């Protein structure tokens, strides 16, 4: 039924001088002539099935390019969709993979981040989910892999965030949050604290009574 519907609607759309664009579920049946496929499931690899049939495609994998997901530890973040796509996850994504067939790169139209707004009640909620990850998306789209440098990007982000402050845009500061993982070891728990920013200093205490921030020395 999906294939029949897409064949009919594809013919109609083309008769109006327009292009058909659709999600990668189209690869499960008939793909309209000339249709552009958006690869979203998992890492977007279903779009490559369309490329094998000569179709152009856009990479927008849910695992790293769905901006509705949390940007850091969920207990620090406003309620949104499940899963984490940190600023670093977005920045490190490379749409062109080394194991691709040579013709795939020529059919790739670009990369896209997607945002669904069922958890956004105000424009400010959209700002929080989009910024600063939108800057990382720009780096993915415009920078070659060998040109990317996470540390330099963070320095640029500090200046960019000052610009957002001036504009009154309420961006996420999740890049400064501390993530912890706990692992059972010999009847005890081993705790690992980490931050996606290497310049963040992590201080802690084993004292259960909080009185003031931990001293530097």
Q: Which ranges hold each PLM region?
A:
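Polar, glycine-rich mid-to-C-terminal structural blocks
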Residues: 54-58, 65-70
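Active-site neighborhood of glycoside hydrolase catalytic domains
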Residues: 1-33, 41-43, 47
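C-terminal functional modules
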Residues: 120, 138-198
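Beta-strand signatures of extracellular beta-sandwich domains
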Residues: 203-205
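Substrate-binding cleft of secreted/luminal carbohydrate-active enzymes
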Residues: 109-151
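Conserved small/polar residues in nucleotide/adenosyl-binding loops
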Residues: 210-217
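Conserved, mostly hydrophobic/aromatic
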Residues: 13, 37, 134
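Hydrophobic faces of well-ordered beta-strands that scaffold small-molecule active sites
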Residues: 20-22, 37-38, 57-59, 109-113
């Amino acid at each position: 039924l999906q294939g029949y519907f897409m064949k009919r609607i594809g013919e109609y759309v083309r008769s109006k001088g327009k292009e058909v664009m659709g999600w990668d579920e189209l690869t499960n049946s008939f793909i309209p002539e000339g249709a552009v496929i958006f690869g979203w499931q998992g890492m977007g690899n279903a779009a490559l099935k369309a490329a094998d049939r000569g179709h152009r495609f856009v990479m927008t994998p849910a695992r790293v390019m769905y901006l509705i997901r949390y940007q850091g530890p969920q207990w620090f973040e406003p309620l949104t969709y499940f899963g984490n796509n940190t600023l670093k996850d977005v920045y490190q994504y490379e749409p062109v993979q080394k194991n691709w067939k040579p013709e795939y790169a020529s059919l790739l139209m670009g990369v896209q981040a997607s945002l669904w707004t069922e958890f956004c009640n105000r424009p400010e909620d959209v700002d929080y989910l989009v910024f600063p990850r939108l800057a990382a998306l720009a780096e993915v789209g415009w920078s070659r892999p060998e040109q990317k440098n996470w540390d330099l990007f963070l320095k640029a982000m500090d200046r960019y965030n000052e610009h957002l402050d001036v504009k009154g845009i309420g961006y996420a500061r999740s890049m400064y949050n501390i993530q912890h993982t706990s692992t059972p070891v010999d009847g005890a728990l081993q705790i690992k604290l980490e931050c996606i920013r290497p310049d963040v200093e992590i201080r802690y205490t084993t004292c259960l009574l909080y009185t003031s921030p931990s001293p530097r020395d």
